[in-house]
């Protein structure tokens, strides 16, 4: 007998936002219902809110389409941000020197489950 699936997951890899900035937004939605999380993300003026909203939408769509879960009963059971690869660049400076510029990326993961 097949076990009933109660959660769905979505991941965005190598997103061009530092993990430190994305974590400030992801902490706001962890443990909230999906409807409340969308409301919070819509009115959060931080740079990562739009990207995290896209991942949350994808997780909800996965739950609905792949596992036939009811959207009204879903909540954000897990939400975390890991560091991705860093793009290393150099800015030319005075007297022939150069300063490093690290363009950081992150992996955003959101898991929604049935209450």
From Swiss-Prot:
GO cellular component: cytosolic large ribosomal subunit
SUPFAM superfamilies linked: Ribosomal protein L22
UniProt entry tagged with the keyword Ribonucleoprotein: yes
A Gene Ontology molecular function term of the record: structural constituent of ribosome
PROSITE patterns, A to Z: RIBOSOMAL_L22
Taxonomy, superkingdom: Bacteria
PANTHER family found in the cross-reference section: CHLOROPLAST 50S RIBOSOMAL PROTEIN L22-RELATED, LARGE RIBOSOMAL SUBUNIT PROTEIN UL22M
Family: Belongs to the universal ribosomal protein uL22 family.
Described purpose of this protein according to its UniProt entry: This protein binds specifically to 23S rRNA; its binding is stimulated by other ribosomal proteins, e.g. L4, L17, and L20. It is important during the early stages of 50S assembly. It makes multiple contacts with different domains of the 23S rRNA in the assembled 50S subunit and ribosome.
Subunit architecture: Part of the 50S ribosomal subunit.
Protein name per Swiss-Prot or TrEMBL: Large ribosomal subunit protein uL22
Organism: Ligilactobacillus salivarius (strain UCC118) (Lactobacillus salivarius)
Gene name per UniProt: rplV
